[in-house]
Amino acid sequence: MTLRILALAAGVGALAAPAAAQQEPTLEFAFEEIVGLGQATAPGDTARGGRLIIPITGGTFEGPEIKGTIVPGGWDWQLRRADGCTDVEADYFLKTDDGVVINVVNKGVICPGEGGAFRPVRTHPVFEAPRGKYDWLSQNAFVGTLELAPPENGPAVRIRIYRVR
């Protein structure tokens, strides 16, 4: 037990040490999703705000290292806050074209900007991928952009995912 604590302390100490040449993070495009949405359900106001639940009905995704479909059955849990912003938290699964299933939990905040128009929406997806070809998803930080998908996609959103380097 003492050895484990010492190893943990040494690891934390290494993180705290200043880096010789710290680089600013950059973004690298990972993939784009078109996420189909179903009819929203509004269970009502809670102590935290107005809740809205939107089913994820399917979709597609594609990028340089990954491609596949979005598995129907996920949900987007939204919470309208007193300040006019909406917290979004989507939990769903990707299925790659070679059959690998990957969990996504994607959170963000939608807030009105000047004149009531919405500001660009940024998200922070977290992936749980099995070990192997796609474990890079579990081993990196990501950010996303969220917007309505083109009308030909039906009720859907477009999410562009970027790996933080």
Protein language model regions, located:
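Bacterial N-terminal signal peptides
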Residues: 5-16
